[in-house]
Amino acid sequence: MLETLFRQDAQRRLGDIGAADIIVGIPTYKNARTIAPVMRTVAEGLAREFRHLKSVLVVVDGGSPDDTVAVANQMQLPPPVKRLVMSYQGVQGKGSAVHAVFEMARVMRARAVVILEADLQSIAPDWSTRLARPILENAFQIAIPYYLRPLPDGAMTDLLAYPLTRLLYGADVRQPMGGEYALSADFAAKLAARDVWETDVARHGVDIWITTVALLENVKLCQVRLGVKLDDSRELSLSFDPTFVQAIGTLFRLVDIYKRRWLENVATRPAPFYGNGVAAEPPRAWMPAVTAAALGDAFVAGVRRYQRLWRIALTPSTRTAVK
């Protein structure tokens, strides 16, 4: 599978590094502004907390037209952390990059795989180590984040993913679409072998897919407190974009795939937490300026764009009331 994801020169560089204990993968696309501080912060944490382990920081790029790859290649990381910057082949999207990291972990016989986002502004040195520790200690097979986010950054999670996951599957996990997580090598290998990497899972559906598979296939899962998540939101988007369609489309496809599970009407159970941590309120300075007028304009634009679907989904009386 590795030969279909990377060119031969990239495969050679992977072979030169050899085996690893922990791989931290960072999918990138047009992240030239943010990749350096994220890499620096991650490497600092790995060098401090896991100095006795062989850690590899992998940047997996999706063909960025900016200087993302050049910036990542120029980064000097503290020993013993190794750096690997590669571009994958195939469907462009975060899921394809995650798939590539899973395949690299298999080849390098890693014990733990961590995935982080490339535009994190609030990342701390211990984020990757906090996520990896329950995996390295064989306590859990996947660790997902628990953090607070300023509005409306977490709208998809707060309004759809979290309530649906809790209601249908009886799983109280606050961030089922969190973009940061750690997995055991075995679980990562099983996910990599699934026949989903030509679907929206290869794009922005990957995060909710991984969490849902873990919850419904009896994979040992824990939550890890990371505090507050702030990312590099270049501009506030209140419209339906490909990210929304891919992520929520995957969410609803999973609802259909696992229909037998939610028809069982299981009781809600909280996912356990691992370790300590803080969950402070987001600083007011980081709260985006969302006005009632902007929300209203976005709603009207959505109504116009999806009138045909509204006619299918809503009764005439409901449509009249909305108008």
Regions found by a protein language model. Name each.
Residues 1-44:
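N-proximal low-complexity "stem/linker" segments adjacent to membrane-targeting elements
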Residues 55-58, 69-96, 104-107:
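Conserved donor nucleotide-binding strand/loop of the catalytic core
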Residues 61-69, 120:
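A conserved acidic beta->alpha catalytic loop
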Residues 109-121:
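Short beta-strand-to-loop acidic/aromatic patch adjacent to the donor-nucleotide binding site
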Residues 123-145:
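Conserved donor-nucleotide/metal-binding helix-loop-beta segment in metal-dependent transferases, i.e.
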